[in-house]
């Protein structure tokens, strides 16, 4: 996820910094971002202290929580999530802690954020590819 997103942003003339879980002073580096894309693979790793107030946070992570204690750490007091967890015995969480919403200007949800957008773009590009195969003209296959 990291390299393709970085390339898309670079192609849009953004200044991009790519980090990983072992980046020194990761919270400090993240706090400089106007747009923070999290795809680190660890539930709730990006906490409010990683985020510049007003930043846009895009959470690409998909982690399943089955441990009730871990669930409470992230979702205590969230009645809808508590009901779903009690019913299913698990819940999805991204790489961004839910409390980041209190700091961020905008934040994608998990589930229901990046995943549906990815599916929509794949379908759009599939239709365009089929039209190209039939010799029809189409707009570019690039992500917009």
PLM feature segments, named:
Residues 1-60, 65-75, 88-98:
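Glycine-rich phosphate/diphosphate-binding loop of Rossmann-like nucleotide-binding domains
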Residues 68-144:
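Adenosine-phosphate binding glycine-rich loop
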């Amino acid at each position: 996820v990291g390299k393709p997103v970085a390339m898309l942003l670079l192609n849009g003339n953004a200044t991009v910094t790519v980090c990983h879980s072992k980046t020194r002073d990761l919270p400090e580096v993240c706090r400089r971002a106007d747009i923070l894309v999290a795809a680190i693979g660890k539930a709730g790793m990006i906490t409010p202290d990683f985020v510049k107030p007003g930043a846009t946070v895009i959470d690409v992570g998909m982690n399943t929580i089955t441990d009730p204690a871990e669930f409470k750490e992230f979702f205590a007091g969230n009645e809808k999530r508590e009901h779903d967890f009690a019913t299913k015995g698990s819940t999805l969480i991204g790489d961004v802690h839910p409390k980041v919403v209190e700091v961020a200007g905008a934040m994608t949800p998990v589930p229901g954020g990046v995943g549906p957008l990815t599916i929509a773009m794949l379908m759009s590009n599939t239709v365009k590819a089929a039209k190209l195969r039939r010799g029809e003209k189409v707009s570019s296959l690039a992500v917009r």
